[in-house]
């Protein structure tokens, strides 16, 4: 009777395996002790014959319970030390048995930390991990999907048939399977059968590499096989706060900076040409540059311009070029459009060797609905909120993370640490923070849910951001964490232990909008809008601000920076030079978007590359020269960066000359007596003898003039500098009487000796 029950149970389990409804295959497969012997069962769909080899002896199998369940009796526990010999369709092969590996990969401590949301290195357990142990070669798969009915690994190895390799469900909703015959480079997905019987094919949320779009499978990839050479850079970076140093950022999109011809293929190290990844149909016959080509071309370019950092728009894997990378499906993988993870690591390695930091745009606020992604991952709203009033951005067509779920927060926080630890990045810019902080963001009345206190704040998102920043600075004290936050949410750059969000920099969106609005006005009417220029100083010390002229301001009909400016071409260039120079002298760190450094004329288009041909023309060369010299001056003059976040570092001389649209101020730092005088003329009028007060008598050297001929200006200036004269103005007893060029910014430095 007992044997009949046992047989019926085995047949039932086999039936469930065949129909992808078994969440506990180890309960029946592999070696099992029964009546003093070891019954070893192998699941091998569509095999014609299976034999087992153990200790040089071959055991024939039978199929008493199911045509695909092959059984043999062994006289001792084979553990995982046996081979299965498979004949299928006239082709034979030998391998280890996936279900011989019964030990848990993710242990109790790992599960506990993950369930708490505190496993900061969860990527070392989740995903696909290659084992090169001589006794256990293969790949361990691990995925979190607590609501799934069953999960299988699918790929070329099993003709994408989920009946072949069912995974074992462990505690905490974690599923595991060791597959001996898979190797680096193999493509896989998870076939997830839901409780409702639906089948989803999902890419690995923790995958380290994915196929080039439009394909979306995950690729087995090694992680720890790169030889870093930047230890001194990392040590120096983490030894002190970076925000008290000069920071000048070149924001860019790798796929649209520069293209090459598809006929000009990238040659691999082994001499073989790499299949080109077409950039777009907009310019047929063009392809993306690879990470190695960007290493060769981009890094010297950025170094020559004098920027301290490169900011990359999202390079995490994403299916749609038109999302600019902001709709991520592969959170733990640099996009394969440009190459491999190791090639991207080499790009960062070389950046550090050339003294350039790397900042990544990070998008923890939302994710797309693509079927292979996180949406409805295991048949339930696992990563997102179920209620669209809190779980969906309808305007963007994306879903919002459920920050109240520990495992979801863990997925994101660990992802943040992953990029710093595995790829040695130096900073992040968190996109669309305002959309995370407010439940009613872009939502009409009645389409959002108040929080537990009746307010519109997303308290769970606040806690997540605080946790992410706290953990980041615990691990990497020299990191940059930059918030793109467009509202007046308080204490964005205050530490979490005093209630702040914990970022150390925030984009100054108010300054950006005010300045662009101001410079778009005809200069003759700017006298009525002087407050747009001066207002930013009134709140400058409420946060640690970064001034940014970003990609968002040069798309969707807004024009590129040069073409925002009024007037003829000469005035457009002069206005652009004046704005950039004023930006470099205003308190706050700096970020500009690619193309601004030479006066790009066309709007940025993600499917095109920059207008490099413009550099054949002198005015565009002039803008580039201006940026080169501004960055050099900026790094060499501590007054321009050392006290960015201290009121001591800035003092108005005169901000009330509205009739002339002229402002003047001082920049200084508290460790020396050196300081700079900055004077800006935002009209086309040339003032031959303009007086401003200064605190010290003596000689003031003109160290920068945006109207210089080198920059494409009229070259009106002050013959290298000016001596003070005794004249009471602006509450000072000394004055400079200077030539003030049209649409320009001039910088003077007090000299102890001429």
From Swiss-Prot:
Protein's GO biological process: glycogen biosynthetic process
Its EC number(s): 2.4.1.18
EC supergroup of this enzyme: transferase
GO cellular component, one term: cytosol
KW DNA-binding (keyword) present: no
Alphabetic keyword roster: Carbohydrate metabolism, Glycogen biosynthesis, Glycogen metabolism, Glycosyltransferase, Transferase
Catalytic activity of the protein: Transfers a segment of a (1->4)-alpha-D-glucan chain to a primary hydroxy group in a similar glucan chain
Active site residues according to the UniProt entry: 431 (nucleophile), 484 (proton donor)
One annotated GO molecular function: 1,4-alpha-glucan branching enzyme activity
Superkingdom field: Bacteria
Ranges annotated as spanning the membrane: none
Pathway: Glycan biosynthesis; glycogen biosynthesis
HAMAP family: GlgB (MF_00685)
PANTHER family membership: 1,4-ALPHA-GLUCAN-BRANCHING ENZYME
Subunit-level organization: Monomer.
Function: Catalyzes the formation of the alpha-1,6-glucosidic linkages in glycogen by scission of a 1,4-alpha-linked oligosaccharide from growing alpha-1,4-glucan chains and the subsequent attachment of the oligosaccharide to the alpha-1,6 position.
Family note: Belongs to the glycosyl hydrolase 13 family. GlgB subfamily.
Name of the molecule in the record: 1,4-alpha-glucan branching enzyme GlgB
Species, as recorded: Prochlorococcus marinus (strain MIT 9515)
Underlying gene: glgB
